[in-house]
Curated annotation (Swiss-Prot):
Heme b binds at H64, H93. This is Hemoglobin subunit gamma. CDD domains: Hb-beta-like. GO terms for molecular function: haptoglobin binding; heme binding; metal ion binding; organic acid binding; oxygen binding; oxygen carrier activity; peroxidase activity. The gene is HBG. It comes from Loxodonta africana. Belongs to the globin family.
Amino acid sequence: MVHFTAEEKAAIASLWGQVNVEETGGEALGRLLVVYPWTQRFFDTFGNLSSASAIMGNPRVKAHGKKVLTSFGDAVKNLDNLKGTFAKLSELHCDKLHVDPENFRLLGNVLVIVLANHFGKEFTPQVQAAWQKMVTGVANALAYKYH
């Protein structure tokens, strides 16, 4: 279980309140697919993923990115129970989708980069540390079923 301090919870919640879920989610998933092209195999029904511009402009990538980032909203609300919050998604990704759990860590790291880009100076080292802790906790919760 990950323990978050009151300061970390406040930093996460404060930034989350300013996140444009649709824009940020689409960008994070798009960047994942561009930077780590082997992750594209899980999205073979998404149509054209042949180039960075095709991926970043793909409406299915944007829609799924929004869906993924929306689930991070559940994490923000349930920081003290990430494993329970993501139990069903862990089962889905393990048993049905067969997603390599390393991809959860990669997506979390990409999300932190996107947030840093969007929020600039507001994304202080303390805020980054809190978010990195959260995305690592989410990745571990999603990977739980694999163990």
